[in-house]
């Protein structure tokens, strides 16, 4: 169903990321919840079937008064979903807002330009802070895979991050 989409507010990025991170932790009805949250922030959200020949995870563009984010669920796992979503959100706020003719498409294996690199970095840091992650890895560099699994569980719980997202980072 089409939701009413609010006006887009270019100063709401931090709030939006916090709200999405809460949603990733719970990870129930995630697609509907994403649509609902994004519409409140003035962003249209669409899921399309993955493309056969092209490894596209998502794309974003401006449509009328609002930005639109499209995800393909090519890799149907919460860590990929969260990353792809935050990647496109970064494009919306940092690139599309000032240049509405532009379109961004995330294709796996494509040559990475500065905009894509920035969006990747933002998505990663929004899910798990860089310093937090590096500290975790340093502390647990010498432990067995089984022990690491326990540490990942603890880390996820302690920092209120979805366990599968932490695991995705680790792999």
Can you annotate each of these PLM segments?
Residues 1-171:
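Active-site hotspot residues in diverse enzymes, especially metal/ion-binding acidic/histidine motifs
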């Amino acid at each position: 169903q089409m939701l009413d989409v609010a006006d887009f507010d270019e100063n709401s990025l931090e709030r939006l990321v916090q709200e999405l991170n809460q949603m990733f932790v719970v990870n129930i009805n995630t697609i509907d919840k994403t649509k609902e949250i994004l519409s409140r922030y003035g962003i249209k959200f669409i899921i399309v079937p993955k493309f056969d020949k092209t490894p596209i995870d998502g794309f974003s563009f401006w449509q009328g008064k609002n930005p639109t984010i499209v995800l393909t669920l090519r890799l149907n796992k919460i860590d990929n979903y969260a990353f792809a979503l935050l990647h496109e959100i970064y494009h919306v706020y940092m690139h599309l807002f000032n240049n509405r003719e532009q379109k961004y498409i995330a294709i796996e294996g494509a040559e990475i330009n500065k905009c894509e690199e920035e969006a990747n970095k933002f998505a990663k840091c929004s899910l798990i802070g860089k310093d937090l992650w590096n500290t975790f890895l340093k502390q647990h560099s010498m432990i067995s895979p089984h022990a690491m699994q326990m540490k990942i569980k603890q880390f996820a719980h302690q920092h209120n991050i979805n366990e599968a997202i932490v695991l995705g980072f680790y792999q």
